[in-house]
Amino acid sequence: MGIWNYQLLNVFAESPLGGNPLCVVEQAEGLSDAQMQALALQFNLSETVFLLSSEQANAHMRIFTPGAEMAFAGHPSIGSAAAVSRLQGDLQRLTLACRAGLVPLDQQDGIWYFSPPKAAEITPVSVPAAEMAAALGLQEEDLAAAPVWVNTGSDQVLVALKSTDALQRAWLDAAKLACWPRSSVGRRTVFLFVPDEAEITARYFFERPNGGTGEDPATGSACANLGAWLQHFRPADSDRQWKVWQGAQAGRPSCLYLQVAPQGQIRVGGKVVFFASGSFTL
């Protein structure tokens, strides 16, 4: 039997009980893949990170949802950076490794920023837009553009909407999921946003492993994909910064700081609140 320590953090949090909760297991050597997956289900957060030693980076992240391992995810990267900094001597700049590649991070004015691990890929979605709108409880007229796949480390469907009213009405209907495309890791998700606002409002829905759908309060990888969407479809909006608000309807108000540069660089940032720590024995 062994003892492992963990930290509970709220990522993209502007208040102590806001943001997206994250569990970071420190020095996770000795845990099997099956144990990591079972522990992610035990903690039952949107993601749980297991930190391992790395020769290429300050630490290697294994990122698990309750149902699957992820190649990359944004709020685990931000939260892990804060946790690793705390463990390794208050670092202001570090690199984390994950299955998708290396993720550089730095802290500025209390905000941790990451750059996504790969160049953006944008491809069409094969499902008709009207069918996808119906699965969201919307009309095709509510869409501001055709849904697309965007991948800067985690492939997701992005759907731009015309109004905040449509955004507030939207919900991924579990009864209509059969039409929804799956990502490279078999997940059904969607990131909805209204692109015309000075401060972007967004929502992220996902299929739960055991049925039904849920809403994520803050999704850093999707925010990075949003940056790629803006670069591709709104090049005039390059070299800008946005606050992206997410999570209000989920009861966890969250703020993501998005920076988009005309030469292609994307940075996503957020504040991290340390909430609790503990240990478990296996």
Predicted regions and their residues:
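Acidic, low-complexity central loop/insert segments
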Residues: 58, 64-181, 197, 231-282
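Short beta-strand-to-turn element immediately C-terminal to the catalytic PLP-Schiff-base lysine
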Residues: 24-27, 51-52, 158-162, 193-195, ...
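Short glycine/threonine-rich catalytic loop with a Thr-x-Gly-x-Asp
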Residues: 70-74, 212-226
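Short conserved micro-motifs on helix faces and helix-strand junctions that flank
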Residues: 16, 41, 71-72, 150, ...
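Catalytic strand-loop segment that frames the active site of acyl-thioester-processing enzymes
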Residues: 186, 198-210
